[in-house]
Amino acid sequence: MATQQRPFHLVVFGASGFTGQFVTEEVAREQVSPERTSHLPWAVAGRSREKLLRVLERAAMKLGRPTLSSEVGIIICDITNPASLDEMAKQATVVLNCVGPYRFYGEPVIKACIENGTSCIDISGEPQFLELMYWKYHEKAAEKGVYIIGSSGFDSIPADLGVIYTRNKMNGTLTAVESFLTISSGPEGLCVHDGTWKSAVYGFGDKSNLKKLRNESDMKPVPIVGPKLKRRWPISYCRELNSYSIPFLGADVSVVKRTQRYLHENLEQSPVQYAAYINVGGITSVIKLMFAGLFFLFFVRFGIGRQLLIKFTWLFSFGYFSKQGPTQKQIDASSFTMTFFGQGFSQGVSPVKNKPNIRICTQVKGPEAGYVSTSIAMVQAAMILLNDASDLPKAGGVFTPGAAFSRTKLIDRLNEHGIEFSVISSTEV
């Protein structure tokens, strides 16, 4: 992608937010990466110069780079001020948007980026926002030749590219995949910043509008190849991983389905069915999550209930979410593993009347999911936009990560930066 002689190749918008601080650190690492062959001019953007400077100073101390603050531009920008968003977009080739919940704050950034010929990457895990932005802005982005790529953090690059990786590694036709997410933590346990909790509360509280949006889109169904993938019970046991699991309620399924539609309709690839689950451990964890889930699903239906869920986040989430977010010790001790079980047909075997005769198991592993892996994924996606434009879809538009990056070297870059893709087993039966 041409940098268009703009002052900054990258601008991190919302750099002083909880997630934005991690993205800022990751861009700073990329700036001095031994692999870089050219200078990476970049900036941070937000409402407060003082807060942005503090973020840069903390990153400088952590990375041992005392001159970092003087190397990075600062742009004062407010989500409620469209003119300031325009000024930010005009100075960037790619904006990394870290300001959420995106259902409230994401659209003005996308609009400003498209109008000013700037590409944009976000880390939204909100299906309604992601799908609505496609319908509203895909054609406009294509006309401008810019790339708007959502869900480019832990939601949903590991899942979306994990399915593509599994397809690429199968010697035949992949027809169905189940993924199982395992989150590991240290002695201090897990914690997630309440921004993620708020996005979930608002998303579940507005599910009817997502259903309405999908009905109005009136898209023809993607064909099912091979046997239809059976959905598991709300609580099921995964023998291969020796753990109980529940359906994963994030954006992964929505994103992967949209990617598979794109690959089928635009690249004539055989579509893959997909289901996502998260491992919750033993029966004690199952009972605890059942209570938390029942409370959540009851209260999220009502306006006052949503207010209570947001006001008393720590209580209703059983301590998994907090306004302070995880400590550095919790982050350092956390990691994730996403295991993919795929099935399909070897070359020459028709999926019409036969049973699947190939099984494949792959994994994506990485450091702490919500902030460390998210930052790595987001920044490496931006590097692809800047450096590998020839492998992107020829026209711009609004894309899922898989649709945008399926033919790029993003998986290779992620492997080099600590998010590892691997084949565990592959058998023909």
UniProtKB/Swiss-Prot annotation:
GO terms for biological process: glycolipid biosynthetic process. InterPro entries: NAD(P)-bd_dom_sf, Saccharopine_DH-like_oxidrdct, Sacchrp_dh_NADP-bd. Keywords: Acetylation, Oxidoreductase, Phosphoprotein. GO terms for molecular function: oxidoreductase activity. GO terms for cellular component: lipid droplet; membrane. It is an enzyme of class 1 (oxidoreductase). Its EC number is 1.-.-.-. SUPFAM superfamilies: NAD(P)-binding Rossmann-fold domains. The modification N-acetylalanine is found at residue 2. The modification Phosphoserine is found at residue 217. PANTHER family: SACCHAROPINE DEHYDROGENASE-LIKE OXIDOREDUCTASE. Belongs to the saccharopine dehydrogenase family. This is Saccharopine dehydrogenase-like oxidoreductase. It comes from Bos taurus (Bovine).
